[in-house]
Amino acid sequence: MWDELPVELWIHIISFVENPVKLLTCNKFFLKFIPLHCYNKIIHTKFKKNRSKNILKIAVENGYINVVKHIDNLKKKKSILVQNPWIFGYDVCILFDICCKKGHLDLIKYIYSELVRNQYSKDIRVKIWDGLKTDDIKYLTSAISHGHYDIYVYLSGCIASFNYFQKKYIIHTIIKYRQLKIFRYLFRKAPKEFRYYALKIACRYGSLKIVKFLIKKGAKIETDNYFAIDIALSNHHYRTVKYLLSTLLDVKIPVYWTWLDVMNDLLGYYEDNDKIKNIMLRSNSKICDSSFKILSLEEITYKNINELFIGQKLNAKQHKNIIDLYISNYKNRESSNENSSIEHLCCVIKHLMENMELDSIKYIITETNLDPFIANFIHKQSLEINSFDTTIFL
């Protein structure tokens, strides 16, 4: 019944719409009123405000496939209605990219098939590649970044093959946007040589679900001297680090990162300390004894202070969290554990002085507010170390 109303009445109704452009694109029935908008002052004014809103683009953005088909059909018939290029003309590549981002699979299939048909090509795979110029796999990455699994599957099936660098870029994009479902699909077809590359990228972005998936599928953590753990640590993805360490029964300490550095980073991460403790218990049996299961993270650090310092240089710049921990416990020491708190801090000071870490000693003196006991201990230690001059602190 509504389509039987006279044109004059429809023009009057449209004049009350806040944005007539949206109404005119929601159904192919309303397209015939577009040439008449200039005859109504109110509609013309509103339409002029939205002049940058291309009718064809809006129809594609909203997934109105019937409207898009109707516009194309009118163009083929060379209808006067769609002669204005500012309203009904738009670049097909941009429209295709919009569909990939918005998730309009039916429109993607339509635009794709129309492109092939118009160019009289029998090879659909080539046309999506050459006709739409997808050399930079732009449309595929648009679908990935917006999580449109069905579109990714369709487009990847339309492309004959990917070269080595395109495969790496696609893997990188999928992991960056944490698209696990798409990654699972890709993994079934990707060669094994990309597993470790994917693990490194997943550790870089902290994509824990993808990391777990790769480990279960056989990705090797120990490759390149546990470089995946190093990447996760350097990007502060401690949940990922905790998971990687928890999958290992024993870890040989890599030459370019030390357990002292790991402990400092983990102490700076105040979530799930119990899990961190359990990881340390499993990851290095020589340092962590099973009796430490009842201890806190701080107590584990204390118990292993001598082992952690072996062959390593502690300093306030690189290991501030660890030194702050000892200073804090010294300041807040109780009678029950006073001796142990003093002993721990003295052990740290002695280690720093033996390694000539003057800035770190200055830091401790400042943070302890020139504590007499600490100052006296430093002076006594300096007498044993001839090359260490305490006058620099005066």
Swiss-Prot record:
UniProt-recorded name of the protein: Putative ankyrin repeat protein L109
PROSITE patterns assigned: ANK_REP_REGION, ANK_REPEAT
Protein keywords: ANK repeat, Repeat
Pfam families reported for this sequence: Ank_2 (PF12796)
Start and stop residues of the ANK repeats: 51-80, 91-120, 135-164, 166-193, 194-223, 225-253
Top-level taxonomic group: Viruses
SUPFAM superfamilies registered for this protein in UniProt: Ankyrin repeat
